[in-house]
């Protein structure tokens, strides 16, 4: 027992409170921002002729990201170009990747945007690493749902 008047004697255990609406609002805002970022990336890749674009929802499987975006390119030059286009288009909005790996070899470029990780492969490297198989428990999403339809760009 705590002596009367001590701080511990005045503390009452409260039942767990329901999360404040502002927390729910923040989570919704974050979800929308992450989805918008994924849409921007997939739209850019599609616009610049990336092949076999896949979006895998991995948030329930890992804390690394919410989405993996995987795409193929026809050559190392195409891989670098796709990486440049994505970085440039998101950069216009002040969004920079946390890191980019593999750019110098351009066999596989990884672009880490926090909640969205982009994997750009040459076809052979994609077949070899087979990330779709490694992350098969993730939810495969319809790529068409991530492509923004715009007017004449």
Where are these regions (language model features)?
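Short hydrophobic/aromatic beta-strand micro-patches
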Residues: 70-72
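A common structural junction motif
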Residues: 87-93, 139
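Short, residue-level hotspots on alpha-helical faces of the histone-fold
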Residues: 85-88, 115
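Active-site phosphate-binding and catalytic loops of NTP-dependent enzymes
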Residues: 92-100
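A short, glycine/Asx- and small/polar-enriched loop/turn
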Residues: 63-66, 112-115
